[in-house]
């Protein structure tokens, strides 16, 4: 039974990681408000190494539609500005001395719908990942049956437990999706 518990625990942990990855993906997709996590995935070249933006500058929210980026070193201003411009976010930073202001444009209805479509794709990818984890766990359990290490009753119970874990995580994905869709469609 210890092996089965380990398999279930592993499946739950891997599904939690998928759920966290989905939350991070959702955080990158902005709604109408500025938030610092919007720029988290942007990397800049710093002395030959690509590092996250938040390791070379202070990112803060100036107002509901503006982020401010304050580099710790003056020579990083143009590098950071270029990194923000070339990101897939479609933002146009404005530099004022050593402070980079990043105004967020108002989302059009068309862009909102496109973002909802992207959010749904991310959620579906998370669901698929969780189903794959379930499949892997069930396969491992079937291997134990072949090696006669567990009984068929144990197999059935373990597969039911893994299915419950999967259902729970997929429900969480659906809840996150509903919240994010509502957030994106808010005017």
UniProtKB/Swiss-Prot annotation:
One of its GO terms (biological process) is cytoplasmic translational termination. Gene3D superfamilies: 3.30.1360.40, Ribosome-recycling factor. The keyword Ribonucleoprotein does not apply. GO terms for molecular function: ribosomal large subunit binding. It is found in: Cytoplasm. Keywords: Cytoplasm, Protein biosynthesis. The keyword Chloroplast does not apply. InterPro entries: Ribosome_recyc_fac, Ribosome_recyc_fac_dom, RRF_sf. Pfam families: RRF. Its main location: cytoplasm. GO terms for cellular component: cytosol. Belongs to the RRF family. PANTHER family: MITOCHONDRIAL RIBOSOME RECYCLING FACTOR PSEUDO 1, RIBOSOME RECYCLING FACTOR. Responsible for the release of ribosomes from messenger RNA at the termination of protein biosynthesis. May increase the efficiency of translation by recycling ribosomes from one round of translation to another. This is Ribosome-recycling factor. The lineage of its organism: Bacteria, Pseudomonadati, Pseudomonadota, Gammaproteobacteria, Chromatiales. The gene is frr.
């Amino acid at each position: 039974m210890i092996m089965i518990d380990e398999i279930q625990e592993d499946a739950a942990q891997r599904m939690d990681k998928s759920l966290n990855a989905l939350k991070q993906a959702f955080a990158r997709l902005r709604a109408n408000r500025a938030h610092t996590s919007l720029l988290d995935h942007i990397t800049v070249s710093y002395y030959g190494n690509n590092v996250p933006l938040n390791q070379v500058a202070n990112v803060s929210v100036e107002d509901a539609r503006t982020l401010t980026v304050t580099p710790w070193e003056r020579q990083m201003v143009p590098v950071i500005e270029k990194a923000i411009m070339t990101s897939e976010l479609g933002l146009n930073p404005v530099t004022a001395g050593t402070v980079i202001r990043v105004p967020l444009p108002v989302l059009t209805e068309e862009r909102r719908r496109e973002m909802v479509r992207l959010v749904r794709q991310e959620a579906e990818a998370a669901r698929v990942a969780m189903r794959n984890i379930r499949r892997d766990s069930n396969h491992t359990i079937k291997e134990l049956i072949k090696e006669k290490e567990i009984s068929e009753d144990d197999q059935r119970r373990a597969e039911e437990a893994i299915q419950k874990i999967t259902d729970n995580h997929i429900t969480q994905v659906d809840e996150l999706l509903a919240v994010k869709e509502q957030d994106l469609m808010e005017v």
